[in-house]
Amino acid sequence: MNVEDLKKSVTNIVHSMYNFDCSEIVSLTRPPKPEYGDWALSLPLKLASLLKSPAIDIAQSIASALLELDGVQDVYVAKPGFINLKLSREHTTGIISEVLEQGSSFGRNTTQSSKKINLEFVSGNPTGPLHLAHTRWAAVGDSIARILINCGADVTREYYINNVGNQIHLFSESVYARALSKSLPKDGYPGEYVKDIARRIQCEFPNIIDLSYEDAIKIFRKRSWQIQIEEIKKSCIAFRVNFDVWFSEESLHEPDRFGKSQIDKALARCKQNGYLFQKNGAFFIRTTEFGDDKDRAVLRSDTSYTYYAADCAYYLNKINRGFSDLVILVGADHHGYVKRFQAMSNIFHVDSENNRKNVQVLLGQMVLLKNKRQSKREGNVIGLSEIIQSVGVDPLRFWFCRYPIDTPIDLDEQHLKKRSNDNPVYYVQYAYARTRSLIRSANLLQMEKFGFFPELLVHETETALVSLLYDYKTVVIDAARFLQPHRVVRYLESLAGAYHKWYDKCRIIPRKGILDKSEAELVNTRLELNRAVGQVLYNALDLIGVSAPERM
């Protein structure tokens, strides 16, 4: 019985006793002290007002039913209505065998199996290298995808290429100016990468500078962003991020055989549903009806489309591809997107409440390096490839996933390079390497297997480790439910800390070899615990795209 099974049992008990569904409010937590039991339940306090009954009476009734469950050893009730559960020794230590039997599958579940999710992240403009904030979105977005897939979801990783608009034009003009060795246009893009792109285009088209401006700029406009996207793709792959779809904004503007673009069709849908109106020669969508601070323009008076028009078409494109959930990671400076995307969900599905899609916009804070923000426009970009070369993939992915995305991060390159226990990624990876070292030592000594006796695991550090192994499934389920990979990282740090403490307190393999049968049984039992911890460390590290080194 895992935590989710225990929650279901509590839900069933309450339903049978009170004909009340408590599935949305039931939660189990670890008690503040081990002697209080394995799990604490405060549900009676929540039910008291709902059921118009004293919390202590509800607690007593639930406790009596819990005692009948397999694996529950004792149940304690404390005023004003708390319940503490103690599971049987055999039940708690059974998690070790479960981990070893399931191996890399341990922790997988089907809690998200009903969902087909489009996860859009990074989506940096193809006007320069990905910077530190993009690196953070890459680490977090890909980890969210891994966690959701682990929980049974069908996930598409998607990158939206913003290859339409003034910034693309300005970028093309900047590359063209570099090719001609001329000064940049006003608000142009500086940086060596612009010169590199110019040189590459000149190699592809040796006579391009002899062409007229009109002919040359067409080539520069197309190839500049394409070359930059090629570099972005290489950087993402090096960072262990593989997008399933690279979606071009340009495709939303392209007409079909009837002369209608995807944007045209999206706006027609808005008009059909009664949300498109004209004002001062421009067209707007009534997004204020769904909490937006103002109605959004989609077609200017000069007949050019706005970015929001493309956003509407892109949303409809995703829906037409059959996604049930849309998750979008953007920077905190895009906070206005939340209401706009929620408005789309209502506008395009006005005919059916059930067909409205779950749209989640995750807002991420900036990353600072030496207290300096990065800007392509200022030419002080530290690109993804550069930071990977300096720090490494593992430290970056671990560090960026370590914090909630709405928390600003200061990146200390030197700290992340340290091979010491105050560097979290080293601390966790070293724990895994230690588990592998013990296994190699045991194999080298040709220790005979004497069986597994979990009742021998009585040291307080062993009890702590077993409890943490038991928590893993719930951590993963919650990380998927709330789209929060930092839950996995913090769990990894807790498990690694408990393992190092156990390693230091308990002698797993005697220095002078096994002396007798009873000692051999304890050694082998501890080796099984060691293997289980190593497996869970490996599984959890994989969820955030961080390697598990055999040696360090």
From Swiss-Prot:
GO cellular component: cytoplasm
GO biological process: arginyl-tRNA aminoacylation
Catalytic activity: tRNA(Arg) + L-arginine + ATP = L-arginyl-tRNA(Arg) + AMP + diphosphate
GO molecular function, one term: arginine-tRNA ligase activity
Keyword list, A-Z: Aminoacyl-tRNA synthetase, ATP-binding, Cytoplasm, Ligase, Nucleotide-binding, Protein biosynthesis
Entry EC number(s): 6.1.1.19
Annotated compartments: Cytoplasm
Span(s) of short sequence motif 'HIGH' region: 124-134
Database matches in Pfam families: Arg_tRNA_synt_N, DALR_1, tRNA-synt_1d
Domain of life assignment: Bacteria
InterPro entries recorded: Arg-tRNA-ligase (IPR001278), Arg-tRNA-synth_N (IPR005148), Arg-tRNA-synth_N_sf (IPR036695), ArgRS_core (IPR035684), DALR_anticod-bd (IPR008909), Rossmann-like_a/b/a_fold (IPR014729), tRNAsynth_Ia_anticodon-bd (IPR009080)
Family that this chain belongs to: Belongs to the class-I aminoacyl-tRNA synthetase family.
Subunit (UniProt): Monomer.
Record's protein name: Arginine--tRNA ligase
Organism annotation: Tropheryma whipplei (strain Twist) (Whipple's bacillus)
